[in-house]
Amino acid sequence: MKFGLFFLNFINSTTIQEQSIARMQEITEYVDKLNFEQILVCENHFSDNGVVGAPLTVSGFLLGLTEKIKIGSLNHVITTHHPVRIAEEACLLDQLSEGRFILGFSDCERKDEMPFFNRPEQYQQQLFEECYDIINDALTTGYCNPNGDFYNFPKISMNPHAYTQNGPRKYVTATSCHVVEWAAKKGIPLIFKWDDSNEVKHEYAKRYQAIAGEYGVDLAEIDHQLMILVNYSEDSEKAKEETRAFISDYILAMHPNENFEKKLEEIITENSVGDYMECTTAAKLAMEKCGTKGILLSFESMSDFTHQINAIDIVNDNIKKYHM
Protein backbone atom coordinates (compact mmCIF):
# COMPACT_ATOMS: atom_id res chain seq x y z
CA MET A 1 0.00 0.00 0.00
CA LYS A 2 1.32 3.43 -1.02
CA PHE A 3 0.25 6.74 0.51
CA GLY A 4 0.30 10.21 -0.94
CA LEU A 5 -1.34 13.61 -0.61
CA PHE A 6 -3.57 15.71 -2.81
CA PHE A 7 -4.29 19.42 -2.68
CA LEU A 8 -7.67 20.93 -3.51
CA ASN A 9 -6.64 24.48 -2.55
CA PHE A 10 -10.16 25.65 -1.73
CA ILE A 11 -10.54 29.22 -0.57
CA ASN A 12 -13.31 30.49 1.71
CA SER A 13 -14.04 32.91 4.53
CA THR A 14 -11.22 31.45 6.65
CA THR A 15 -8.62 30.64 3.95
CA ILE A 16 -7.43 33.25 1.45
CA GLN A 17 -5.53 32.51 -1.76
CA GLU A 18 -2.11 33.33 -0.38
CA GLN A 19 -2.63 31.12 2.68
CA SER A 20 -3.81 28.17 0.59
CA ILE A 21 -0.77 28.36 -1.68
CA ALA A 22 1.67 28.89 1.20
CA ARG A 23 0.32 25.89 3.10
CA MET A 24 0.58 23.69 0.03
CA GLN A 25 4.22 24.70 -0.28
CA GLU A 26 5.02 24.16 3.42
CA ILE A 27 3.34 20.76 3.61
CA THR A 28 5.01 19.61 0.39
CA GLU A 29 8.45 20.44 1.76
CA TYR A 30 7.57 18.73 5.04
CA VAL A 31 6.29 15.43 3.60
CA ASP A 32 9.23 15.19 1.19
CA LYS A 33 11.26 14.10 4.23
CA LEU A 34 8.70 11.46 5.27
CA ASN A 35 7.42 8.19 3.79
CA PHE A 36 4.76 9.43 1.40
CA GLU A 37 4.96 8.38 -2.24
CA GLN A 38 3.43 11.28 -4.18
CA ILE A 39 1.59 14.61 -4.16
CA LEU A 40 -1.05 15.52 -6.75
CA VAL A 41 -2.51 19.00 -7.34
CA CYS A 42 -6.10 19.65 -8.39
CA GLU A 43 -7.02 21.83 -11.39
CA ASN A 44 -9.94 24.25 -11.07
CA HIS A 45 -11.22 27.29 -12.95
CA PHE A 46 -13.55 30.21 -12.27
CA SER A 47 -14.58 29.45 -8.66
CA ASP A 48 -13.29 29.34 -5.09
CA ASN A 49 -13.16 25.53 -5.26
CA GLY A 50 -9.44 25.66 -6.01
CA VAL A 51 -6.93 28.38 -6.85
CA VAL A 52 -4.79 26.33 -9.24
CA GLY A 53 -5.74 26.67 -12.89
CA ALA A 54 -2.36 25.34 -14.07
CA PRO A 55 -1.39 22.21 -12.11
CA LEU A 56 1.62 21.45 -14.31
CA THR A 57 3.07 24.87 -13.51
CA VAL A 58 2.57 24.25 -9.80
CA SER A 59 4.01 20.75 -10.15
CA GLY A 60 7.18 22.19 -11.65
CA PHE A 61 7.54 24.62 -8.75
CA LEU A 62 6.96 21.93 -6.11
CA LEU A 63 9.32 19.51 -7.85
CA GLY A 64 11.99 22.18 -7.60
CA LEU A 65 11.42 22.45 -3.84
CA THR A 66 11.73 18.73 -3.20
CA GLU A 67 14.22 15.91 -3.62
CA LYS A 68 12.49 12.53 -3.57
CA ILE A 69 8.69 12.65 -3.57
CA LYS A 70 6.79 12.30 -6.85
CA ILE A 71 4.61 15.28 -7.77
CA GLY A 72 2.08 15.95 -10.48
CA SER A 73 -1.39 16.92 -11.55
CA LEU A 74 -4.44 15.28 -10.03
CA ASN A 75 -6.94 16.01 -12.80
CA HIS A 76 -5.37 17.99 -15.63
CA VAL A 77 -8.36 18.61 -17.92
CA ILE A 78 -6.99 17.44 -21.25
CA THR A 79 -10.26 18.13 -23.10
CA THR A 80 -9.84 21.90 -22.75
CA HIS A 81 -6.09 22.08 -23.41
CA HIS A 82 -4.05 21.48 -26.55
CA PRO A 83 -2.67 17.92 -26.35
CA VAL A 84 0.73 18.79 -27.81
CA ARG A 85 1.27 21.51 -25.24
CA ILE A 86 0.36 19.06 -22.46
CA ALA A 87 2.79 16.47 -23.85
CA GLU A 88 5.60 19.02 -24.16
CA GLU A 89 5.16 20.21 -20.58
CA ALA A 90 4.89 16.66 -19.26
CA CYS A 91 8.08 15.57 -21.03
CA LEU A 92 9.94 18.65 -19.80
CA LEU A 93 8.85 18.11 -16.19
CA ASP A 94 9.74 14.43 -16.45
CA GLN A 95 13.23 15.38 -17.65
CA LEU A 96 13.82 18.16 -15.11
CA SER A 97 12.70 15.99 -12.20
CA GLU A 98 14.47 12.86 -13.49
CA GLY A 99 11.28 10.83 -13.46
CA ARG A 100 9.42 12.26 -10.47
CA PHE A 101 6.55 13.83 -12.43
CA ILE A 102 3.09 12.20 -12.57
CA LEU A 103 0.38 13.06 -15.09
CA GLY A 104 -3.04 12.70 -13.53
CA PHE A 105 -5.65 13.79 -16.07
CA SER A 106 -9.39 14.12 -16.45
CA ASP A 107 -12.26 14.78 -18.78
CA CYS A 108 -14.10 18.07 -18.32
CA GLU A 109 -16.57 17.72 -15.43
CA ARG A 110 -17.94 21.26 -15.50
CA LYS A 111 -20.03 21.76 -18.61
CA ASP A 112 -19.58 25.55 -18.58
CA GLU A 113 -15.86 25.09 -19.27
CA MET A 114 -16.36 23.45 -22.67
CA PRO A 115 -17.94 26.49 -24.38
CA PHE A 116 -15.68 28.87 -22.45
CA PHE A 117 -12.58 27.20 -23.91
CA ASN A 118 -14.29 26.96 -27.32
CA ARG A 119 -14.61 23.17 -27.30
CA PRO A 120 -17.53 21.28 -28.93
CA GLU A 121 -19.79 20.07 -26.11
CA GLN A 122 -21.60 17.52 -28.28
CA TYR A 123 -18.32 15.70 -29.01
CA GLN A 124 -16.78 15.90 -25.55
CA GLN A 125 -15.98 12.20 -25.11
CA GLN A 126 -14.56 11.85 -28.63
CA LEU A 127 -12.38 14.92 -28.10
CA PHE A 128 -11.17 13.61 -24.74
CA GLU A 129 -10.16 10.28 -26.26
CA GLU A 130 -8.42 11.89 -29.22
CA CYS A 131 -6.47 14.24 -26.94
CA TYR A 132 -5.31 11.30 -24.86
CA ASP A 133 -4.14 9.34 -27.90
CA ILE A 134 -2.01 12.27 -29.06
CA ILE A 135 -0.53 12.79 -25.60
CA ASN A 136 0.15 9.09 -25.14
CA ASP A 137 1.87 8.77 -28.52
CA ALA A 138 4.07 11.76 -27.70
CA LEU A 139 5.02 10.47 -24.25
CA THR A 140 5.67 6.86 -25.25
CA THR A 141 7.35 7.32 -28.65
CA GLY A 142 8.60 10.91 -28.58
CA TYR A 143 6.52 11.75 -31.65
CA CYS A 144 2.91 12.32 -32.68
CA ASN A 145 1.16 12.48 -36.04
CA PRO A 146 -2.61 12.62 -35.51
CA ASN A 147 -5.13 12.23 -38.28
CA GLY A 148 -8.38 12.58 -36.37
CA ASP A 149 -11.62 14.51 -36.32
CA PHE A 150 -10.24 17.32 -34.16
CA TYR A 151 -6.46 17.33 -34.69
CA ASN A 152 -4.59 16.70 -37.93
CA PHE A 153 -0.99 17.77 -38.45
CA PRO A 154 2.35 16.40 -39.76
CA LYS A 155 4.58 14.25 -37.60
CA ILE A 156 6.34 16.28 -34.91
CA SER A 157 8.95 15.48 -32.30
CA MET A 158 8.65 16.11 -28.58
CA ASN A 159 11.53 18.23 -27.39
CA PRO A 160 12.68 16.98 -25.01
CA HIS A 161 11.52 13.37 -25.10
CA ALA A 162 10.34 11.92 -21.80
CA TYR A 163 12.97 10.93 -19.24
CA THR A 164 10.95 7.90 -18.11
CA GLN A 165 10.65 4.98 -20.52
CA ASN A 166 7.13 5.11 -22.03
CA GLY A 167 6.58 8.47 -20.36
CA PRO A 168 5.60 9.55 -16.85
CA ARG A 169 3.08 7.56 -14.82
CA LYS A 170 -0.50 8.35 -15.86
CA TYR A 171 -3.82 8.21 -13.99
CA VAL A 172 -7.31 9.24 -15.03
CA THR A 173 -9.99 10.56 -12.69
CA ALA A 174 -13.07 8.32 -12.53
CA THR A 175 -15.58 10.99 -13.58
CA SER A 176 -18.15 8.72 -15.26
CA CYS A 177 -18.90 5.12 -16.17
CA HIS A 178 -17.91 5.87 -19.77
CA VAL A 179 -14.47 7.14 -18.71
CA VAL A 180 -14.01 4.12 -16.42
CA GLU A 181 -14.79 1.69 -19.25
CA TRP A 182 -12.50 3.56 -21.64
CA ALA A 183 -9.66 3.50 -19.08
CA ALA A 184 -10.15 -0.21 -18.41
CA LYS A 185 -9.71 -1.05 -22.10
CA LYS A 186 -6.39 0.81 -22.13
CA GLY A 187 -5.16 -0.33 -18.71
CA ILE A 188 -4.97 3.21 -17.31
CA PRO A 189 -5.33 3.24 -13.50
CA LEU A 190 -8.11 5.31 -11.96
CA ILE A 191 -8.23 8.00 -9.32
CA PHE A 192 -11.45 7.57 -7.33
CA LYS A 193 -12.99 10.87 -6.23
CA TRP A 194 -13.45 11.81 -2.58
CA ASP A 195 -16.96 13.15 -3.22
CA ASP A 196 -18.33 10.05 -4.93
CA SER A 197 -20.17 7.64 -2.65
CA ASN A 198 -18.63 4.31 -1.71
CA GLU A 199 -21.37 2.65 -3.73
CA VAL A 200 -20.46 4.59 -6.88
CA LYS A 201 -16.76 3.86 -6.38
CA HIS A 202 -17.53 0.18 -5.86
CA GLU A 203 -19.52 0.03 -9.10
CA TYR A 204 -16.70 1.78 -10.97
CA ALA A 205 -14.15 -0.67 -9.57
CA LYS A 206 -16.26 -3.69 -10.54
CA ARG A 207 -16.90 -2.32 -14.01
CA TYR A 208 -13.20 -1.58 -14.53
CA GLN A 209 -12.24 -5.09 -13.46
CA ALA A 210 -14.76 -6.70 -15.80
CA ILE A 211 -13.80 -4.64 -18.86
CA ALA A 212 -10.06 -4.89 -18.18
CA GLY A 213 -10.38 -8.67 -17.97
CA GLU A 214 -12.10 -8.79 -21.35
CA TYR A 215 -9.25 -6.78 -22.90
CA GLY A 216 -6.44 -8.82 -21.36
CA VAL A 217 -5.21 -6.11 -18.98
CA ASP A 218 -2.99 -7.42 -16.17
CA LEU A 219 -4.85 -6.13 -13.11
CA ALA A 220 -1.85 -6.90 -10.90
CA GLU A 221 -0.10 -3.96 -12.59
CA ILE A 222 -2.98 -1.51 -12.02
CA ASP A 223 -2.45 0.79 -9.04
CA HIS A 224 -5.73 2.67 -8.63
CA GLN A 225 -5.63 5.65 -6.26
CA LEU A 226 -8.35 6.53 -3.73
CA MET A 227 -8.81 10.13 -2.60
CA ILE A 228 -9.80 10.58 1.06
CA LEU A 229 -10.45 13.78 3.01
CA VAL A 230 -8.91 13.71 6.49
CA ASN A 231 -10.00 15.77 9.48
CA TYR A 232 -8.84 14.05 12.64
CA SER A 233 -9.67 15.27 16.13
CA GLU A 234 -10.52 13.64 19.44
CA ASP A 235 -13.40 16.11 19.38
CA SER A 236 -15.33 14.33 16.64
CA GLU A 237 -18.02 16.98 16.25
CA LYS A 238 -15.42 19.71 15.78
CA ALA A 239 -13.80 17.73 12.96
CA LYS A 240 -17.17 17.23 11.29
CA GLU A 241 -18.17 20.88 11.58
CA GLU A 242 -14.83 21.99 10.12
CA THR A 243 -15.26 19.61 7.21
CA ARG A 244 -18.85 20.74 6.58
CA ALA A 245 -17.66 24.33 6.36
CA PHE A 246 -14.78 23.37 4.08
CA ILE A 247 -16.78 21.41 1.49
CA SER A 248 -20.22 23.07 1.53
CA ASP A 249 -19.62 25.47 -1.36
CA TYR A 250 -18.11 22.68 -3.43
CA ILE A 251 -21.11 20.42 -2.92
CA LEU A 252 -23.51 23.18 -3.92
CA ALA A 253 -21.52 23.79 -7.11
CA MET A 254 -20.71 20.22 -8.15
CA HIS A 255 -23.77 18.33 -6.88
CA PRO A 256 -26.63 20.78 -7.52
CA ASN A 257 -29.19 18.04 -8.23
CA GLU A 258 -28.61 16.10 -5.01
CA ASN A 259 -30.04 16.71 -1.56
CA PHE A 260 -27.47 19.00 0.03
CA GLU A 261 -27.65 17.74 3.62
CA LYS A 262 -27.73 14.09 2.57
CA LYS A 263 -24.69 14.51 0.31
CA LEU A 264 -22.83 16.44 3.00
CA GLU A 265 -23.36 13.70 5.59
CA GLU A 266 -22.49 10.98 3.08
CA ILE A 267 -19.11 12.57 2.35
CA ILE A 268 -18.33 13.13 6.03
CA THR A 269 -19.30 9.56 6.94
CA GLU A 270 -17.37 7.94 4.08
CA ASN A 271 -14.17 9.98 4.44
CA SER A 272 -11.77 10.04 7.39
CA VAL A 273 -13.54 12.64 9.49
CA GLY A 274 -13.89 12.45 13.28
CA ASP A 275 -11.95 10.69 16.01
CA TYR A 276 -9.26 8.08 15.37
CA MET A 277 -11.66 5.13 15.22
CA GLU A 278 -14.03 6.94 12.86
CA CYS A 279 -11.17 7.97 10.58
CA THR A 280 -9.60 4.53 10.31
CA THR A 281 -12.92 2.69 9.96
CA ALA A 282 -14.09 4.95 7.14
CA ALA A 283 -10.76 4.66 5.30
CA LYS A 284 -10.71 0.85 5.54
CA LEU A 285 -14.27 0.57 4.23
CA ALA A 286 -13.58 2.89 1.29
CA MET A 287 -10.43 0.95 0.44
CA GLU A 288 -12.34 -2.34 0.50
CA LYS A 289 -14.99 -0.91 -1.83
CA CYS A 290 -12.39 0.14 -4.42
CA GLY A 291 -9.65 -2.44 -3.97
CA THR A 292 -7.02 0.26 -4.42
CA LYS A 293 -3.26 -0.01 -3.95
CA GLY A 294 -2.79 3.70 -3.32
CA ILE A 295 -4.33 6.25 -0.97
CA LEU A 296 -4.27 10.01 -1.55
CA LEU A 297 -5.04 12.11 1.53
CA SER A 298 -6.01 15.75 1.93
CA PHE A 299 -5.65 17.36 5.36
CA GLU A 300 -6.76 20.80 4.15
CA SER A 301 -10.10 20.86 5.96
CA MET A 302 -8.20 21.06 9.26
CA SER A 303 -7.94 24.81 9.80
CA ASP A 304 -5.10 24.65 12.33
CA PHE A 305 -1.78 24.08 10.57
CA THR A 306 -0.22 22.39 13.61
CA HIS A 307 -3.10 19.92 13.73
CA GLN A 308 -2.53 19.15 10.05
CA ILE A 309 1.12 18.36 10.72
CA ASN A 310 0.22 16.20 13.72
CA ALA A 311 -2.24 14.20 11.62
CA ILE A 312 0.34 13.79 8.85
CA ASP A 313 2.83 12.50 11.44
CA ILE A 314 0.32 9.92 12.70
CA VAL A 315 -0.20 8.60 9.17
CA ASN A 316 3.54 8.60 8.53
CA ASP A 317 4.16 6.56 11.70
CA ASN A 318 1.58 4.01 10.56
CA ILE A 319 3.22 3.82 7.14
CA LYS A 320 6.53 2.97 8.82
CA LYS A 321 4.90 0.37 11.07
CA TYR A 322 2.68 -1.45 8.63
CA HIS A 323 3.61 -0.62 5.03
CA MET A 324 7.41 -0.57 4.80
From Swiss-Prot:
InterPro entries: Alkanal_monooxygenase, Bact_Lucif_Oxidored, Bacterial_luciferase_CS, Luciferase-like_dom, Luciferase-like_sf, Luciferase_bac/NFP. It is an enzyme of class 1 (oxidoreductase). GO terms for molecular function: alkanal monooxygenase (FMN-linked) activity. Signal peptide: none annotated. Gene3D superfamilies: Luciferase-like domain (3.20.20.30). SUPFAM superfamilies: Bacterial luciferase-like. Its EC number is 1.14.14.3. Keywords: Flavoprotein, FMN, Luminescence, Monooxygenase, Oxidoreductase, Photoprotein. The keyword Ubl conjugation does not apply. GO terms for biological process: bioluminescence. It catalyses: a long-chain fatty aldehyde + FMNH2 + O2 = a long-chain fatty acid + hnu + FMN + H2O + 2 H(+). One of its GO terms (cellular component) is cytosol. Pfam families: Bac_luciferase (PF00296). Heterodimer of an alpha and a beta chain. Belongs to the bacterial luciferase oxidoreductase family. Light-emitting reaction in luminous bacteria. The specific role of the beta subunit is unknown, but it is absolutely required for bioluminescence activity. This is Alkanal monooxygenase beta chain. It comes from Photorhabdus luminescens (Xenorhabdus luminescens). The lineage of its organism: Bacteria, Pseudomonadati, Pseudomonadota, Gammaproteobacteria, Enterobacterales. The gene is luxB.
